[in-house]
Amino acid sequence: MNKLAGAELSTLLEQRITNYYTKLQVDEIGRVVSVGDGIARVYGLNKIQAGEMVEFASGVKGMALNLENENVGIVIFGSDTAIKEGDIVKRTGSIVDVPVGKGMLGRVVDALGVPIDGKGALSAVERRRVEVKAPGIIARKSVHEPMQTGLKAVDSLVPIGRGQRELIIGDRQTGKTAIAIDTILNQKQINAQGTSDSEKLYCVYVAIGQKRSTVAQLVKILSEAGALEYSIIVAATASDPAPLQFLAPYSGCAMGEYFRDNGMHALIIYDDLSKQSVAYRQMSLLLRRPPGREAFPGDVFYLHSRLLERAAKMSDQTGAGSLTALPVIETQAGDVSAYIPTNVISITDGQIFLETELFYRGSRPAINVGLSVSRVGSAAQLKAMKQVCGSLKLELAQYREVAAFAQFGSDLDAATQYLLNRGARLTEILKQAQYSPIPIEKQIVVIYAAVKGYLDQIPVALITHYEQELLKSIDPGLLSAIVQQKNITEQISSQLATFCQKFTQSFLATHQS
């Protein structure tokens, strides 16, 4: 009996001993040496990684940016008022990451992915690092699908493709954000028609250093138009600390990359990167990094290049997804040759240049067609659009050239007079109201009418009215034929010509009587 008990006891002991293990949880902690202006110097975190998230005793998070011999420079993601000298700082062991996934759509979050719209916690999300390496050359494919903005001036003259990076640059109050919002609104119809995820385009809007009222207004516009359901808004407003304004674009990019890497398409708008570079300059100077040109740190180019390189069109082997970037840069008095504007122009695949003078003259969107360019977009442009707007750019360029001389002389020859008349009408037809994007097939019809000379007899003042009436009376079958064919065949061309001819005659008859 005792013998049996002894054997049982020994096996029981053996089991217990094998199952016994000591799991030591080691927390590496440091102490705050000094704190101020959103920067904390911490002593004792010797094994910390660059870009690692830390937690202060008050619950505020921070990120290690400067790793020095004696101490670590940490930028604080929140208010530094609750942090004092001697406070304990804990390593989290993880690099800064944010929630990503389809559960983010329709939400407004801060730079760390925390919801700020009062709609409760996020659902069905995974986490992803904010700083990842951009896809390599082999993983990419050249841009070949169009990304429609719904703006006639952009889709015809500076077309954008899925996976492209197109800079929107201009002074303050020239309509930079309006172009970005119109692009988001234009995806509503495309997403509604899209049957699969490979056709839809999800949007991420990153607001950097903007007023809270501006962001609230944007949310209102998007939700009223039903565009919030396929959009994510990342907001690091003017009242947020500089580290959050610096981080927001990377967080938004990580959210967009989720779609890109899962065979879907996304568009990300950084509004604007000038404010991000100012926030980064502030952080760098406070971290005592040496200043360079315009007091920016030496790696301010890398700040933007590593962000914008993450926008890409993926190859078929890697899922054929894409991330299109529309960075916004604000210039001072139209100075495109300043440090940050030249940097971003050299990184992107083209720019849309907006001018104050054009804006006040009533040409809105105020795009300077001469200085705006799309370096890869023409490969992605619809063949039908390419066919109608081939001569548009040339005629506008000739018009600008002649218009300068026409101010001096009154007796102009017939050819010059023709160029002036045509140019004035083409300029007028490219004007468009805010928040009213036009589907690509309707744009094609309008530009076709303008380029083929049907507007030459119409008074300039009536052109907007002509355009509205034209789009109302066109046969929907003709529009759907353009969409399906993606090409203006001889049959479509003759139908368009007949329609424009008849419509122009009836329009003139009505308005001359």
UniProtKB/Swiss-Prot annotation:
Marked site (Required for activity) residue numbers: 372
A molecular function GO annotation: proton-transporting ATP synthase activity, rotational mechanism
One Pfam short name: ATP-synt_ab_C
Keyword set, alphabetical order: ATP synthesis, ATP-binding, CF(1), Hydrogen ion transport, Ion transport, Membrane, Mitochondrion, Mitochondrion inner membrane, Nucleotide-binding, Transport
Subcellular localization, as worded in the UniProt entry: Mitochondrion; Mitochondrion inner membrane
Gene3D superfamilies assigned to the protein according to its UniProt record, in alphabetical order: 2.40.30.20, ATP synthase alpha/beta chain, C-terminal domain, P-loop containing nucleotide triphosphate hydrolases
GO cellular component, as recorded: mitochondrial inner membrane; proton-transporting ATP synthase complex
Cysteines joined through disulfide linkages: none
Residues that hold ATP according to the record: 170-177
SUPFAM superfamilies per the UniProt record, alphabetical: C-terminal domain of alpha and beta subunits of F1 ATP synthase (SSF47917), N-terminal domain of alpha and beta subunits of F1 ATP synthase (SSF50615), P-loop containing nucleoside triphosphate hydrolases (SSF52540)
Domain of life: Eukaryota
InterPro entries assigned to the protein according to its UniProt record, in alphabetical order: ATP_synth_asu-like_sf, ATP_synth_asu_C, ATP_synth_asu_C_sf, ATP_synth_F1_a_nt-bd_dom, ATP_synth_F1_asu, ATPase_a/bsu_AS, ATPase_F1/V1/A1_a/bsu_N, ATPase_F1/V1/A1_a/bsu_N_sf
Complex formation: F-type ATPases have 2 components, CF(1) - the catalytic core - and CF(0) - the membrane proton channel. CF(1) has five subunits: alpha(3), beta(3), gamma(1), delta(1), epsilon(1). CF(0) has three main subunits: a, b and c.
Family recorded in the similarity comment: Belongs to the ATPase alpha/beta chains family.
Function (record text): Mitochondrial membrane ATP synthase (F(1)F(0) ATP synthase or Complex V) produces ATP from ADP in the presence of a proton gradient across the membrane which is generated by electron transport complexes of the respiratory chain. F-type ATPases consist of two structural domains, F(1) - containing the extramembraneous catalytic core, and F(0) - containing the membrane proton channel, linked together by a central stalk and a peripheral stalk. During catalysis, ATP synthesis in the catalytic domain of F(1) is coupled via a rotary mechanism of the central stalk subunits to proton translocation.
Name under which the protein is recorded: ATP synthase subunit alpha, mitochondrial
Name of encoding gene: ATPA
